[in-house]
Amino acid sequence: MLKFIDPTERWNVFTHALGVILGIGVSIYFFAQHSSEQPRVLIALGIYCFSLVFLFSASTTYHAVSGDIKLIWRKVDHIAILFLIAGTYTPVTLTLFYETSGVWILTGVWSIAAVGFIFKIFFTGRFEILSLIMYLGMGWFILLDAQTVWELFSTNAFIFLILGGSCYTIGVFFYRWKGYKEAHAIWHIWVLAGALSHAFMINEILLIN
C-alpha cells in the first residue's frame, strides 16, 4: 500500500497507522477491564477512546491522500488534536476530579476545543504559533488545579500525566523543525509516546477511583 503514497509521507503514514492499532487496542482493553463502571464513566471512556482512534485515523488519512482533498483532511487532522486533548480530560474529570474541580476543568477544555474547532475550519495552516499555544494550553490546563492533582493522583498516575505531557511538549520541537524531512515522523513518535502514557494514566485513575 505504501508504494502508492508520496515517499515523503510514508513514515508519517506508518507511524500513525500504528497509532490506530494502539487506539483500538486501548479501547478494547478499557472496555474489557472496566465494563462494570458507572454509566458516567463508561460514556467518558467512550469519548476518550473515540477521540484516540479518531486522531490517529485522521492523521494517517491526511498523510496518505493527495490533491485537493488533502487540505480537507489537514483540517480534520488539526481538529482531531483538539478532540483528543479534550477527550483525554473527560474520563479524568468525570472520575477522580468529579467531586472537586472536574466540571469546570471539563467545561474549560471543551470550550477551548469548540473555539479551536471554529478557528481550524477557517484558519488551518495560518497562525501556527497561536495554534501551538492553544494545544499546549489545553494540555497543561489541569495544572490550574495543581493542588487537587497532587492530592488525588497516585504516584504512578502522576508520573504518567507528566510523562505524557512532556512527550507532547518535546514533540512540538520536531513539529516546528522544518529543515529536516524526517522531523514530522519523529513528532508522530512523540505523539504516540504521549498518547500511550496518558492511556496508562487513565488506567491507573480507574483502578484507584
Predicted regions and their residues:
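Multi-pass alpha-helical transmembrane bundles in non-GPCR membrane proteins
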Residues: 1-209
